[in-house]
A protein has these predicted regions:
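Surface-exposed binding/hinge segments that line
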Residues: 85, 89, 96, 129-171
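N-terminal lobe/hinge region of extracytoplasmic solute-binding protein
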Residues: 38-88, 183
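Alpha-helical secondary-structure segments
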Residues: 36, 110-117, 142-148, 186-187, ...
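Aromatic- and charge-enriched surface segment that lines or borders ligand/interaction sites
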Residues: 82-125, 140, 146, 282-283
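Ligand-site clamp/hinge motif
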Residues: 206-251, 377
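Structural transition elements
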Residues: 279, 309-344, 362
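Gly/Pro-rich hinge or "lid" segments in bacterial periplasmic/extracellular proteins
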Residues: 75, 161-213, 217, 335-336
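Detector for C-terminal structural segments
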Residues: 296-322, 359-368, 388-501
Length: 501
């Protein structure tokens, strides 16, 4: 998920503000050994339990090591884990651990430390902790652990390479201090933090993997405003910055290198949470949800709002096997058919749809116009905390830009009953049956078959109103090279390298 909004946690924010140096000077892209990133998000906790993907994960990669490293093309390689083996049924995993690694406070990394971290994560409540729920960890010997899963977890390696295994010192696990001051074994140490402004990291002396320590200092400069972030890149205040469709061409015209992820990491569209019709009875009607899909002119919308967006009516990525090209255009633009479906559902006169006030006003206006044409009135809910409230089940539907992970990750996140983007816990009989089959076996073939089935069900039952897949852009100065990361909005921290200029 790649939300572009800063979410505050007042207690944590206050503590983070007081950590580190005061009066920190604004970051400057000053020399060949430093890196300054213009970022759109900032962390609200350093506890690995709260680790998130997308724009957040580079923060955690600065101070923590994962057990497994995910390469830019989405493959896996050794990190704190030197090798691993997952059972054929995906219900157990044995991991050999690297020796000789210490945390920044001097504590030793070993099997006991790895178990303590995984136990803490599994017991915690965070954005993706549920992905390891039902997992028990046992120490085999000083440098080996074994994971045993209650149910098949074919994506266990993915989760251990992303949010599920950031290793903190066992001395600080489950302490309040970990929320504001990270203590890890990572390539960098947090030197200072000014909430709402910048986070400065210094290279950790004696770090075990110099290939991940390409800069002596890294600064994350928080710039939520798209124009401000562009200006910082153009003015030399940052070396690299996340760009939007509206700022890409300007950056190119000023001589900046723009790297695009042609794999289209995210999709943008409506997430119809209330498919049971408990909050808004109209959304409980299949015909209404299908009508909403027919009402949107995706090609025109993409041309008006984005750069090189890919119109689609499915949420699964074209990089996976669950994807079907035919599902990209399952719902053509057909307002006449939409009206017929509305009438069939008993809503010829329309209804009111409550949506979050999404940041792109031009997109909002166009969507509102398309829906008005079939007698659906949009009520834009003014809620500065809409993201958290949506996660808490308070919205019937939202406009959102959400990441397309691997097939099973997308399925677990979007169409599982307990998925992070199935906030009202909806489950149709067809989807329930597909999950029942998959839960019996974690074989690669069943994952392939059932995720494709789930994709088809979600489209036919109109769980979503996808608009298009979105390309992500990173602008860089001539001092830095950035390599895009598979299934992530921005490059991983390790994917930036100095050019020597």
């Amino acid at each position: 998920m790649k939300h572009m909004k800063r979410f505050s946690a007042s207690v944590v924010a206050l503590a983070l503000t007081t950590f580190g140096l005061t009066g920190v000077a604004p970051a400057q892209a000053a020399n060949k050994t430093d890196l300054v990133l213009g970022v759109v998000a900032e962390v609200t906790t350093w506890d690995p339990i709260g680790a998130n993907i997308g724009h957040y994960i580079p923060y955690y990669q600065a101070v923590y090591d994962n057990l497994i490293l995910r390469t830019p093309d989405g493959k896996y390689k050794a990190n704190l884990a030197t090798k691993w083996q997952v059972a054929d049924d995906s219900k157990s995993m044995t991991i050999d651990l690297r020796t000789g690694v210490k945390f920044s406070d001097g504590a030793k990394f070993d099997a006991a430390a790895a178990k303590a971290n995984l136990d803490s994560y599994i017991a915690g409540v965070g954005p993706y902790t549920a992905k390891l729920s039902g997992t028990t960890v046992s120490v085999v010997d000083s440098d080996t652990i074994k994971l045993t899963m209650a149910n098949p977890n074919p994506e266990i390696v993915y989760w251990l390479a992303t949010t599920g295994s950031f290793m903190a010192s066992p001395n600080v696990l489950k302490t309040a201090g970990l929320k504001t001051k990270p203590v890890g074994s990572g390539p960098y140490t947090l030197e200072s933090a000014t909430v709402g402004s910048q986070y400065v990291f210094k290279a950790t002396p004696g770090y075990w993997d110099k290939s991940k320590q390409k800069f002596s200092k890294i600064t994350f400069k928080f710039l939520s405003d798209n124009t401000a972030r562009l200006n910082a890149l153009l003015g030399g205040q940052v070396d690299a910055a996340y760009l939007t469709a509206a700022t890409v061409q300007v950056a190119k015209s000023k001589g900046k290198t723009v790297t695009a992820d042609a794999r289209a990491v995210d999709y943008k569209g409506l997430v119809l949470f209330d498919r049971a019709g408990n909050k808004n009875p109209a959304l409980g009607k299949l015909e209404v949800r299908q009508a909403l899909n027919y009402a949107i002119d995706r090609k025109a919308l993409a041309r008006a709002v984005e750069v090189n967006a890919q119109p689609t009516t499915q949420i699964f990525s074209p990089n996976g096997t669950a994807y079907s090209k035919s599902l990209d255009s399952y719902y053509s633009y057909n307002p006449t058919k939409a009206k017929e479906l509305m009438a069939k559902a008993g809503y010829a006169d329309g209804f009111t749809l409550n949506l979050n006030n999404w940041a792109e006003t031009n997109l909002n206006a166009l969507v509102e116009g398309y829906l008005k044409a079939i007698n659906v009135k949009v009520n834009w809910v003014q809620d500065t905390n809409w993201y958290a409230n949506a996660k808490g089940g308070k919205f019937e539907a939202i406009i959102m830009q959400i990441f397309q992970g691997t097939d099973l990750v997308t399925a677990e996140t979007a169409v599982a009953k307990d998925g992070g983007w199935n906030n009202l816990k909806y489950e149709s009989s067809a989807m329930k049956k597909a999950w029942a089959v998959l839960s019996q076996t974690g074989t690669a073939n069943q994952v392939k078959v059932q995720t494709a089935n789930m994709n088809r069900i979600a489209v036919e039952e109109a769980w979503f109103v996808p608009f298009y897949r979105v390309l992500h852009y990173v602008g860089t100065s001539n001092r830095v090279k950035a390599t895009v990361q598979a299934q992530n909005a921005v490059p991983y921290l390790y994917n930036y390298a100095p050019t020597g200029k």
